[in-house]
Amino acid sequence: MLAKQRFVLDTTAFTDNQLRELLGDGDLNLSVDRMLDLIARSRIKLNISCHMPPITYKEFTDYMTRYDCPEETLIKAETWIVKKTPNRYDTQIPSQIFYEYVHDIRERMNKGLRISETLLWEAGIQSIIMASRDVKKTEIESEVLGKAIKDLRKKYRSALRKGTLDSAPDLDVLLLAKELGAGVVAADDGIRVWAERLGLRFLNATSFPKMLKEYLKYYE
């Protein structure tokens, strides 16, 4: 019997756009179905198990349901993906990790504040200039404030969320991987960054199926 390998999968391990092209020629449902076939064969032949926290699994299945995923594919997911809630109380995380995370979030909040202040000043000045030229209030709201709000949403979201943990499913993926001594599979920069800080093995969503195929090629 081969030594058991475990992997904890994020939703992006199935839904990544590059993975769709790699496995399904751009078709999400076909890509997910083929990925699950690889997972099933690897479980039977290579003793490789793939896990998801329940909250992440629900996120994944809800996403697939919105894209009219066939029932057969959802049954495969239910069969071959092991659902387990991480032990949030006994899993040990170094205090330095918490320090780094709080520092990271604080820096992002400060950056988000600076972005907000800059955009507000720019919108305010532009509104005053347009008002002095007797531009209608509705036109100012449409051209200046509408654009400012759109830019603020985009830049603020990027400042606060890109490259860090921004959801409970993300955190559960890392906690479960830490508990099981498992690798992490995702296409999320935040998960990658914090998996590496925790000393966890990390595989990109497009690398994982390639690895499974390579293993299976030599077994079969």
Swiss-Prot record:
| InterPro entries reported in the protein's UniProt record | RNA_free_RNase_P
Report if keyword tRNA processing is assigned: yes
E.C. designation(s): 3.1.26.5
Enzyme's top EC category? hydrolase
Recorded catalytic activity of this chain's protein: Endonucleolytic cleavage of RNA, removing 5'-extranucleotides from tRNA precursor
Keywords carried by this UniProt record? Endonuclease, Hydrolase, Nuclease, tRNA processing
User: Key word Hydrolase present in the record?
Assistant: yes
For the biological process aspect of GO, one term held by this record is: tRNA 5'-leader removal
For molecular function, the Gene Ontology terms on record are: ribonuclease P activity
What role is this protein assigned?
RNA-free RNase P that catalyzes the removal of the 5'-leader sequence from pre-tRNA to produce the mature 5'-terminus.
**HAMAP family (UniProt xref):** RNA_free_RNase_P
| Family under the similarity heading | Belongs to the HARP family.
The protein depicted here goes by the name RNA-free ribonuclease P
Q: Which organism is it from?
A: Methanothermobacter thermautotrophicus (strain ATCC 29096 / DSM 1053 / JCM 10044 / NBRC 100330 / Delta H) (Methanobacterium thermoautotrophicum)
